[in-house]
Every structure is written in C-alpha cells, then in structure tokens.
Amino acid sequence: MPGIFFSHPNALKEVTNKPDEVMAQKKKNFAVPWKNYLKSMLPHLETIKSSSSSSSSDTEKNKLTPNEIIQWTMSLEKLLVSEEGQAVFRAFLKSEFSEENIEFWLACEDYKATNDSEELRCKANVIYQEFIQPNANKQINIDFSTRNSVTKDLLEPTKATFNGAQKMIFILMERDSYPRFLKSEIFFRLAERHHGNNMRG
C-alpha cells in the first residue's frame, strides 16, 4: 500500500457540527482502558468478525487475530493498513455522517498507485468533482489554500496533486474520529461479542 501521511500542520480546523443524537451515542465510558481490555481478552479470542452490517460481508470472509485488533488501537496508520480495519472504521464514520473522509483518503491511495498518465488525469478530475470542488456531493473539510492548490494542479495533475489535502484529512481523522472510534459501540461489540462466545464455549 502506498505511503501514509503522519506529519501534523501547525493548525487544522476540526469538524464538530455533528447531530446531537449522534454525539450522544458516541459518549460511552468503559471500566478499563481499551488496550488493557483487549489484551486481557487475548487468551480467549480466536477470531473476531465485524458486527457492523455494512462491513460484515467483507470482514466475515477474513478471520482476524487478536493481535491484529490490538494493532488497530496503536495508531490510525495501523488501522488503515488492514482492509478489515478500513471496513470497520468506514462503518463508524458512516454512523457519524463523515464517511467522505475515508472515501477520499482511499481514493487518493488508489490515485497515487496509478501509472498511466491519461488514467491519472481522469481519476484526478473524478476526485476533484466528488470531494474538492465547491458544493461537491462529498465535499471534504480542507482550507482555501489547499483547495486552490489542487484546482490549479488539475491542469497538469501529478501523483502529488492531492498530497496536501490527503494529509489534512488523515490528521482530521487521526485527531477527531479515530479516538472516538476506539470507544465506539461498533468497535466495542467487535471485540466483546466474540469474547463472550468463547467464554461460554
């Protein structure tokens, strides 16, 4: 998989305008920290499947090890290098009405893996129209300078055309969505339900 951005800009405006009912569902306190909880489950876990209906068709085909799930708690990078992790995280973002962030990030990864110049130009225009241009259906939250830079690069797009925008969205997910994901019902059930099944068996 192509490289993932980690460097943090000096400033980044985070999205906070979520519906009240969605924010209420995200606030759940657990008795033990997630990393310790998952490690305590390690002897009992054999495989873990996604409990989310939107991603179950992907994850149920691929058995996960407890160590893989624990890796997801270490960093957003480790979560996104896993196809199963991407599917579960995407389901969570969909529940928060911010699925466009992971869709854009994945589109950029695919874009950077494209070698044919005509195909690159075509994909650049699709990404711009879907995520970057004003009033786009899945418009992402990037600043004016970054948006303007992408627009200019469309005349002669390169593999680096969306680098700045992708970096901003990665950091937004890392700071805003990822910490909530680790405390979410989706992630909690992913681990807890199978843990319970093994304990009963």
UniProtKB/Swiss-Prot annotation:
Its main location: membrane. One of its GO terms (biological process) is negative regulation of signal transduction. It holds the Pfam family RGS. It is a peripheral membrane protein. PROSITE patterns: RGS. The keyword Transport does not apply. The keyword Nucleotide-binding does not apply. One of its GO terms (cellular component) is cytosol. It is found in: Cell membrane; Cytoplasm, Cytosol. GO terms for molecular function: GTPase activator activity. InterPro entries: RGS, RGS_sf, RGS_subdom1/3, RGS_subdomain_2. Keywords: Cell membrane, Cytoplasm, GTPase activation, Membrane, Signal transduction inhibitor. Residues 75-191 form the RGS domain. Regulates G protein-coupled receptor signaling cascades, including signaling downstream of the N-formylpeptide chemoattractant receptors and leukotriene receptors. Inhibits B cell chemotaxis. Inhibits signal transduction by increasing the GTPase activity of G protein alpha subunits, thereby driving them into their inactive GDP-bound form. This is Regulator of G-protein signaling 1. It comes from Xenopus laevis (African clawed frog).
